[in-house]
């Protein structure tokens, strides 16, 4: 019985390794146009779920091969000074997240504007906006975009609005309205949210997705599916359709940047429990968040460098 059990474990591990290697090799580097002068790829790490210090996080991502980190703009002066010191020490770049949790429109807008203006003064590589709420009106929402365009012109810092559930651009149909009416709108594409919102891989909204891809300058490289914003493990073969769909969208964005000689930035953003599926009763994550994000970084680097 023990021998059979050991044989089962050994054969299962071997089979799993084979499936994993198959899933990795199925995403060989695509044929891309020669990159024009100015094209560059930067990949950032998320501190979402990390419980150590800024210095510990910076050291870990530097060793893993990241170019920098994307983190929420620290409103506390001491925390901010520590972060900026660590970035300089480890020679890492930074993108800042800004937003607000206020439900009242006027309070939300005021807090958003304050945080955005402060973050822009620090001259990050970019600012990613969790803009507004999904229940704000079109006219209210447009005020966020008008303000970000103003700050972009004043500071030169690229500012993007994320396609995120609960925010202004929570759905493809809503985002299209803003894309068509706000010429200066630039996007952080986290299309995993739209897969979840529309319960599909968006095959019935190809024109809308194409419009969004053309406005994208920054990508959150998390893979979603029709029933959730994050697959359990993108290396697992059962998620191959989801992985292929997301890479097909990202390929198009990168192809455009290569042709235009422009920069593309990525954030590997697989989240911790409970964003990652967990086991019942224990809330134990079913996969290792850090390992998945590093895997994604390595695949992106190989594919798009």
Sequence positions of predicted segments:
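Active-site acidic/histidine proton-transfer and metal-coordination neighborhood
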Residues: 14, 21, 104-186
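Hydrophobic faces of well-ordered beta-strands that scaffold small-molecule active sites
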Residues: 37-46, 69-71, 94-99, 127-129, ...
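N-terminal pre-domain/capping segments
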Residues: 2-114, 287, 294-305
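Aromatic/hydrophobic pocket-lining residues that form the small-molecule binding cavity
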Residues: 54, 80, 108-112, 141-145, ...
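Short glycine-rich, flexible loops that bind phosphorylated cofactors or substrates
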Residues: 78, 136, 228
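Active-site beta-loop-alpha junctions enriched in small/polar residues
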Residues: 44-49, 72-74, 99-103, 132-134, ...
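Acidic (Asp/Glu)-rich catalytic clusters
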Residues: 34, 58-63, 77-95, 111-123, ...
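Histidine-acidic metal/acid-base catalytic patches
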Residues: 11-13, 29-36, 55, 181-186, ...
